[in-house]
């Protein structure tokens, strides 16, 4: 969660649908980067710091609405470290083929953290929403490569040799 607009809008949509169709409401979980977690810490962060640049927000615009959504849904908000975010980032890219920016992976990191601590509800469907494509933050992807990007001569042999070196 950065400015908390998404979780607020999602909750509003769920409530409106529930009121029209009498559906069950979900329990909402929100995760902020540890270095930019004003809602978790209940204080404005003057100089937020995190690798997850899209959620590097020290004073969210929808702060109170997000707290209301979490309270009304009996949900929770927690923080995740940059290391947990990067672990989730690599897991999603490597195992699932999902290339999303680090900020989006805060939700995955949070679910992993809840699962490891035994706090994830058992027998429930869990949905994590990843809104940001990995191309929004290519520097993180490049920094994690084992085989660094380099200019190649424009010939088939060089390209094949480079690809074989990456596999």
Language-model-detected regions and their locations in the chain:
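Short, glycine/acidic-enriched capping/hinge loops at junctions between secondary-structure elements
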Residues: 9, 40-41, 138-141
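Short beta-strand segments
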Residues: 1-2, 29-32, 128-131
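Active-site/ligand-binding loops adjacent to catalytic centers
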Residues: 14-99, 143-167
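Gly/Ser/Thr-rich beta-alpha loop segments that engage phosphate groups in nucleotides
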Residues: 4-7, 32, 60, 134-136
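Catalytic phosphate/nucleotide-handling subdomain of diverse soluble enzymes
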Residues: 108-167
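Active-site nucleophile and cofactor-binding loops and adjacent substrate-binding regions
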Residues: 1-3, 81, 98-104
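Short glycine/serine/threonine-rich phosphate/pyrophosphate-binding segments
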Residues: 2-11, 36-39, 104-111
């Amino acid at each position: 969660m950065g400015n908390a607009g998404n979780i607020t809008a999602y909750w509003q949509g769920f409530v409106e649908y529930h009121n029209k169709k009498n559906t069950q409401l979900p329990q909402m979980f929100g995760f902020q980067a540890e270095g930019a977690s004003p809602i978790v810490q209940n204080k404005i962060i003057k100089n937020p710091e995190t690798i997850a640049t899209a959620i590097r927000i020290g004073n969210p615009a929808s702060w109170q609405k997000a707290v209301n959504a979490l309270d009304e849904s009996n949900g929770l908000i927690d923080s995740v470290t940059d290391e947990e975010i990067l672990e989730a980032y690599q897991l999603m890219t490597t195992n699932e083929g999902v290339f999303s920016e680090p900020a989006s992976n805060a939700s995955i990191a949070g679910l992993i953290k809840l699962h490891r601590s035994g706090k994830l509800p058992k027998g429930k469907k869990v949905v994590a929403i990843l809104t940001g494509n990995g191309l929004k933050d290519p520097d993180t992807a490049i920094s994690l490569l084992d085989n660094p990007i380099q200019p190649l001569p424009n010939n088939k042999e060089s390209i094949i040799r480079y690809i074989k070196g990456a596999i």
